[in-house]
From Swiss-Prot:
Cysteine pairings via disulfide bonds: none
Subunit structure: Part of the 50S ribosomal subunit.
Compositional bias of kind Basic and acidic residues: 264-273
Keyword Ribosomal protein: yes
Protein name stated in the entry: Large ribosomal subunit protein uL2c
Localisation per UniProt entry: Plastid, Chloroplast
Gene: rpl2
Organism for this UniProt entry: Lemna minor
Amino acid sequence: MAIHLYKTSTPSTRNGAVDRKVKSNPRNNLIYGQHRCGKGRNARGIITAGHRGGGHKRLYRKIDFRRNEKDIYGRIVTIEYDPNRNAYICLIHYGDGEKRYILHPRGAIIGDTIVSGTEVPISMGNALPLTDMPLGTAIHNIEITLGKGGQLARAAGAVAKLIAKEGKSATLRLPSGEVRLISKNCLATVGQVGNVGVNQKSLGRAGSKCWLGKRPVVRGVVMNPVDHPHGGGEGRAPIGRKRPMTPWGYPALGKRSRKKKRYSDRFILRRRK
């Protein structure tokens, strides 16, 4: 991804750094409208996920995470921007006339061919079961449940690694550092998700952040005591607690929040970093 810097004519362009322009011209049969309700509220109207609301209207692109067009070669026709994720998407024209969107693999260009199946080449963008991949393969869009579609390593720049195969399971090292067991029959896509340099982007101004549906973040230490455990005090005061707390009084910043005795604990060999 090429980072573009604007001329320093205004404060927003002086501080902004965006990626190259990738146009979005979605097909009508692969998009549908969605009503973004809630804005971080639950059924009672209470904020459960903060700093959400507003944002530009979006059309959802239907992405083929299952890759169930077996043994039919497809050609990459376009590489498009998707407002619903930080990775780019590719429009694929298959040999039988089917047209679908997939996540853009890093390095894929218009005109490349891809295929899904059991006995397909180990090349970028191809989808096949883990049992048919050699050890050390870089993969993304990984299934957890067979036939449900890819659920792991789908963000921009994400990549997992196949490190072992034993019995009915394969061992993967995920982008978070977690080492996990997954069925060898589950599908995954070879390669890394594109748009690797997305973390180098700088929006440059608060308005660009609002377009993404993200509202301003206020520190708890500048609030009143009624609003946050860190609030109150005369002037600039410390938080007055042994450790940082959430707005609801629970430990924050480093406290493990995963529930104990989950069914999936048996598949996790090493927790994420």
